Amino acid sequence: MSGFNDRYSHLLSKARQAMRFGRCAWAVQSTGEQVAVALVLNRADWLDELGYTLAEAIERAGQEWVAMIPQVARQLAESR
């Protein structure tokens, strides 16, 4: 379970950075992180910039990350 917690914390941290500092914080992340963070933040424009459709982004992020996205998004919304 700690592996899940580590990955959850990592995604939350990357999404929080992008939420606070915008595109410049997002642009330096790995492609996988960029895709997952764009999904968390509901940024279809960022996905488009990467050349991903929504369906392709979900596939790229993978089942484990996609499962975390709603919870990470809720936690970010609650912390605003």
List PLM regions with ranges.
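Charged, low-complexity intrinsically disordered segments and flexible loops
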Residues: 1-37, 41-80
